[in-house]
Amino acid sequence: ALIGIVGRPNVGKSSILNRLMGQKIAIVSSKPQTTRNRITGVLTQGEYQLVFFDTPGMHKPKTSLGKYMVRSVNESVGGVDCCMLVVEAGKEPGDTELNLIEKFKSMEMPAILAINKIDTLKEKEELMKQIARYSLLYDFDAVVPVSAQDGNGMNELLDELRKQAGEGGHFFDDDTLTDQPERVIVAEIIREKILRLCDREI
């Protein structure tokens, strides 16, 4: 199954992808807009193969780079079997989430809602209210609270994603982890370290 990972910047999309894959595929930083390429993670377990498109966060583009990144998100939503919408625990749905949900509706897109950063919530009631709000907005195939930070909920999320895999064949060889060349991954990891050292986006 082709899975598009979508959501606003800095909700933990890349961290979730890295958790699901079990190793670093996508660059992770607190700086906005660090994911520039549609990095693909390929997870093969027996008959299941999940191909992940990790998209840049949705935002209103101010630059030509920003426009390219938003176009990349739109393309990801268009060509996948299922979308995983990642939102931050305790945060109200905003324009980004509502726009993506409208896209899901227009395409009748199977979608899974991953509520990340549940480790930051003090009250469980906040989470229950958030799940109820999103359930009114769209008929998600599953809603899974997770923490990419400590790994909570990742097995449940993977189970739900596997259900989307269906009977389709494998797109990649079983030992493939990403379609990004190794030198690109190395460059991304170096860029992540630079971003952590610098106060502003490179």
PLM ranges: what are they?
Residues 184-202:
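P-loop NTP-binding site
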Residues 44-49, 68-143:
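Conserved C-terminal guanine-recognition region of P-loop GTPase G domains, centered on the G4
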